[in-house]
């Protein structure tokens, strides 16, 4: 029996070692290493937090990862200091200030945070139920989790599942992660603890 027990333990440990998670911090808390700024809006580090703020041009702006990410779980915290529209893009590419890909909405309560919007394409693919409008807390830190695997996307805000969607076009998407400043001005959002686990 001791031989069988040893074999079981060996198989168990080899299985757990193979499943070792590869989690990467996307933001080092000091500078924008690993990111690319698109547009003229403001991206900077303050108090070890990543801040996006509308500039005088009041145009779209993006901060995108240098690396592409295919299947992953992204976790982050965001705090909205002003009204305004932001978002987290996945499997996306940016050319100038035109983005191709999919956005997980980050907006004030009542404006579909956690929903999926396809820019320059089909528009809204899915919005959370209106009963979830009050999940986002303005002026406070909110937890967001985004899981992208194959053609399926699930989003959570403050541990509440916001949406789940299966979409063949998303399944074919290739690109990185990007944070957005919407046009129109008046936007200021803080971000921290951006961590991505490759699946």
State what each model feature region is.
Residues 1-11:
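Short, small-residue-biased leader/transition segments that mark boundaries at the very start
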Residues 15-199:
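Carbohydrate-interacting regions of secretory-pathway proteins
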């Amino acid at each position: 029996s001791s031989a069988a027990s040893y074999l079981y333990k060996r198989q168990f440990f080899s299985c757990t070692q193979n499943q070792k998670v590869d989690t990467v911090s996307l933001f080092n808390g000091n500078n924008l290493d690993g990111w690319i700024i698109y547009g003229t809006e403001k991206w900077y580090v303050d108090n070890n937090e990543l801040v996006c703020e509308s500039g005088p041009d009041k145009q779209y702006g993006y901060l995108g990862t240098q690396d592409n990410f295919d299947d992953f779980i992204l976790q982050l915290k965001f705090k909205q200091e002003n009204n305004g529209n932001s978002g987290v893009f996945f499997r996306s590419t940016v050319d100038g200030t035109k983005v191709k890909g999919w956005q997980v909405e980050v907006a004030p309560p009542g404006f579909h945070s956690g929903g999926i919007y396809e820019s320059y394409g089909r528009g809204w693919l899915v919005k959370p139920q209106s009963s979830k409008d009050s999940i986002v807390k303005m002026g406070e830190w909110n937890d967001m989790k985004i899981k992208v695997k194959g053609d399926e996307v699930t989003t959570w805000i403050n541990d509440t599942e916001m949406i789940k969607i299966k979409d063949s076009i998303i399944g074919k998407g290739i690109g990185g992660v990007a944070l957005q400043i919407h046009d129109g001005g008046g936007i200021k959002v803080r971000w921290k603890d951006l961590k991505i686990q490759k699946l």
